[in-house]
């Protein structure tokens, strides 16, 4: 299965695995799954780390290097951006909306820890 991980799952998998639920850990550890990340996650980490948020202490450059070295990047393309307009107005977080659009356009499952994101239609799994 192809899985797009949200930012929290990426951060926890990279630096705080104890915060992962058993379900999330099982999905990430399953070698039959292809894992992906969105550049929107790096954007979110860079912005929130720059704001000195306690939950975003990971250096986005190091995170990117580790993720890129494993071939996990799902680039943001025009179709993803255009799909955002058709999403329901569940909430306004631009990062979440990009992930939902990417997952929908690509036909892959977005794995998230956010119950608001899980309310969007499409291939989304709350863990």
Question: Where are each of the predicted segments found?
Answer:
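Short, well-structured N-terminal submotif of metal-dependent ribonuclease cores
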Residues: 1-37, 51-65, 106, 115-120, ...
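Generic structural signal for small/hydrophobic residues in well-ordered secondary structure
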Residues: 7-8, 45, 84, 103
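Active-site neighborhoods of divalent-metal-dependent phosphate/nucleic-acid chemistry enzymes
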Residues: 57, 61-64, 68-116, 127
